[in-house]
């Protein structure tokens, strides 16, 4: 479907397949086994028009409209209604206190919305939050579910009057204050085409008939928004959705939604694969068949090869093919998708010498002292290069540098942040190689390298730990720890003696044991096992292992560890140690 904008794509779907299912939301709050609520394409379009008509009374073209509602069909309708009205949508979660409120405050201040779209179940929280913001002109608050959404509507908005910007995707803020990535309709459309080309490279970018997208990811997160709302509309595919809470309550629900007659395309971060493998029982899967699954992409956080293997092994008896699991790399500044693994085969893992990798050189090896990394295809579109971030010169094969991205999926910048936009989106390569544009390049802030025509990702440059003069990826250290503890952990470096940095690991555990003595003995055994594993796998001695209860490590709204906050809490001795 060749269209210029999301509203145009929705209009085309409503015209071409009006009575086909568009979005189905599985509500597990009404019933433990789920209640399916479905909108057809014509119903969705009509509801979108009614929201747009209501918004026509608020502000003008290009003004911002925040969507702050629970996960559900009302959120989908609200987001699309904002676009239909020619407003710039701002996806957000419902304020609930703590980090969520800090994020909401930051987004509301930065975007200055003329309206907030919510629901009657969440309006009290939204009103209360907005009321705490004195001195600002309050936005109109609209309860979407109280509108007459199914009323006949002749609302129109000319295609050429839509602003080029579709929505602001605020970053998770794991290393800084959230910034609004300015996403255009073109960015979203192009990235959808790139995504389809990457995942369906062997079928000319076209999935088989009877395909559907399955997602529980939050709509305010880039992967949840694109996979859950934008991709179904741009492709004209049905979507089956539920909430993150429903998944966390019972991970088997995700597996159930994918074990359907249709060909499921789904996505989740690494932790979800771990959770599903550990907490889904054989009884949960009785009578289920995963053989129709098309693709499950793993992205949004570092993909751990051991987790993928556990997930594949766990569900193999239910006909899951390991080749459908596709490790993927992307970021909000590039809409969502940049690269994925090779199609038609299980994810490939390559071992590299840890010592050499710490020094910036990729040296394949076998045996101990290795860091296992997953390989990704170098995409044709967008263009990806590995660049020395200091000299802006392309790195030779096997040399670690910063991942730079160029293409029409890359945003123009951050909302009202010209200096930061120039630093991040205005990269220029010095003496580019043949076929390589000089610029502009998105500087991703991620380190990686290319060897044998494959790309490997190490992690966030800002998160790199420098211990005794060597660079270490916290993701690698955390993966080693999680193989033992299975819970969330954070590897950080803090100042030590003589101007050196020392390694500290914060580890979430449940304090188990028949007695306090048994529990303490178990904690001691875990500390010894972790210490030994870090020494043998990474050549590192850990200065302090801080064992804490689940939920103690500060995270972003998308579940990423806030390492800066961890460092501050550690320095202030604010972690409640289980073995104190």
Curated annotation (Swiss-Prot):
Disruption-associated phenotype: Disruption of fadD28 abolishes the production of phthiocerol dimycocerosate (DIM) on the cell envelope. Grows normally in liquid culture, traffics into host (human and mouse) acidified compartments early after phagocytosis, suggesting it no longer arrests phagosome maturation as well as wild-type, impaired growth in mouse macrophages.
Regulation acting on activity, per entry: Inhibited by acylsulfamoyl (acyl-AMS) analogs.
Keyword Lipid metabolism: yes
One GO CC annotation: plasma membrane
Pathway stated in the Swiss-Prot or TrEMBL entry: Lipid metabolism; fatty acid biosynthesis
Keyword annotations from UniProtKB, A to Z: ATP-binding, Fatty acid metabolism, Ligase, Lipid metabolism, Nucleotide-binding
Broad class of enzyme this protein falls into: ligase
GO MF entries: adenylyltransferase activity; ATP binding; fatty-acyl-CoA synthase activity; ligase activity
Site (Important for substrate selectivity) residue list: 227, 330
InterPro entries tied to this protein: AMP-bd_C, AMP-bd_C_sf, AMP-dep_synth/lig_dom, ANL_N_sf, FAAL/FAAC, LCFA-AMP_ligase_FadD28
Listed EC numbers: 6.2.1.49
Family: Belongs to the ATP-dependent AMP-binding enzyme family.
Protein role: Involved in the biosynthesis of phthiocerol dimycocerosate (PDIM), a cell wall-associated lipid found only in pathogenic mycobacteria. Catalyzes the activation of long-chain fatty acids as acyl-adenylates (acyl-AMP), which are then transferred to the multifunctional polyketide synthase Mas for further chain extension. Probably plays a role in host phagosome maturation arrest.
Protein name: Long-chain-fatty-acid--AMP ligase FadD28
Organism: Mycobacterium tuberculosis (strain ATCC 25618 / H37Rv)
Gene assigned in the entry: fadD28
């Amino acid at each position: 479907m060749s269209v210029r904008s999301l509203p145009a794509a929705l209009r085309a779907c409503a015209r071409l397949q009006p009575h086909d299912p568009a979005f189905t939301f599985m509500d597990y709050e009404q019933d433990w086994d789920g209640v399916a609520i479905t909108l057809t394409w014509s119903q969705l379009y009509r509801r979108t028009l009614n929201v747009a008509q209501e918004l026509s009374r608020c502000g003008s073209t290009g003004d911002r409209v925040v969507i702050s509602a629970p996960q559900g069909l009302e959120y989908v309708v609200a987001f699309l209604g904002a676009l239909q009205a020619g407003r710039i949508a701002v996806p957000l979660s419902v304020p609930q206190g703590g980090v969520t409120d800090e994020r909401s405050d930051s987004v509301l201040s930065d975007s200055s919305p003329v309206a907030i779209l919510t629901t009657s179940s969440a309006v009290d929280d939204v009103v209360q939050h907005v009321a705490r913001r004195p001195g600002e002109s309050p936005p109109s608050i609209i309860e979407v579910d109280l509108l007459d959404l199914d009323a006949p509507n002749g609302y129109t908005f000319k295609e050429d009057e839509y602003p080029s910007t579709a929505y602001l995707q605020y970053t998770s803020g794991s290393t800084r204050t959230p910034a609004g990535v300015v996403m255009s309709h073109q960015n979203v459309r192009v990235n959808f085409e790139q995504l389809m080309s990457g995942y369906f490279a062997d079928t000319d970018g076209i999935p088989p008939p009877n395909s559907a997208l399955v997602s529980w990811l939050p709509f305010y997160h880039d992967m949840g928004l694109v996979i859950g709302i934008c991709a179904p509309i741009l492709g004209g595919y049905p979507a089956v959705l539920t909430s993150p809470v429903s998944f966390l309550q019972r991970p088997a629900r995700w597996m159930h939604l994918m074990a359907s007659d249709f060909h499921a395309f789904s996505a989740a971060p690494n932790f979800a694969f771990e959770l599903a493998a550990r907490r889904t029982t054989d009884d949960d899967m009785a009578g289920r068949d995963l053989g129709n699954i098309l693709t499950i992409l793993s992205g949004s956080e570092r993909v751990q090869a051991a987790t993928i293997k556990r997930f594949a092994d766990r569900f193999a008896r239910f006909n899951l093919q390991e080749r459908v699991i596709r490790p993927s790399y992307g970021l909000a500044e590039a809409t969502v998708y940049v690269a994925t693994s090779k199609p038609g085969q299980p994810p490939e893992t390559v071992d590299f010498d840890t010592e050499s990798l710490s020094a910036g050189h990729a040296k394949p090896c076998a045996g101990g002292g290795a860091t296992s990394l997953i390989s990704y295809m170098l995409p044709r579109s967008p263009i990806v290069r590995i660049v020395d971030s200091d000299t802006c010169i392309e790195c030779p094969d096997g040399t670690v540098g910063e991942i730079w991205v160029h293409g029409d999926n890359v945003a123009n910048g951050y909302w009202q942040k010209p200096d930061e936009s120039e630093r991040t989106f205005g990269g220029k390569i010095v003496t580019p190689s043949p076929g390589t544009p000089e610029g502009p390049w998105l500087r991703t802030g991620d380190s990686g390298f290319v060897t044998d025509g494959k790309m490997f990702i190490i992690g966030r440059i800002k998160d790199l730990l420098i211990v005794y003069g060597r660079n270490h990826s916290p993701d690698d250290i955390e993966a080693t720890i999680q193989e033992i503890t299975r819970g969330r952990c954070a590897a950080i470096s803090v100042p030590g003696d003589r101007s050196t940095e020392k390694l500290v690991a914060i580890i979430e555990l449940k304090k188990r044991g028949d007695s306090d003595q048994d529990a303490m003995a178990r904690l001691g055994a875990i500390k010894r096992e972790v210490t030994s594993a870090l020494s043998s796998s990474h050549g590192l001695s850990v200065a302090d292992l801080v064992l804490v209860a689940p939920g103690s490590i500060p995270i972003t709204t998308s579940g990423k560890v806030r390492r800066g906050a961890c460092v501050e809490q550690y320095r202030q001795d604010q972690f409640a140690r289980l073995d104190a």
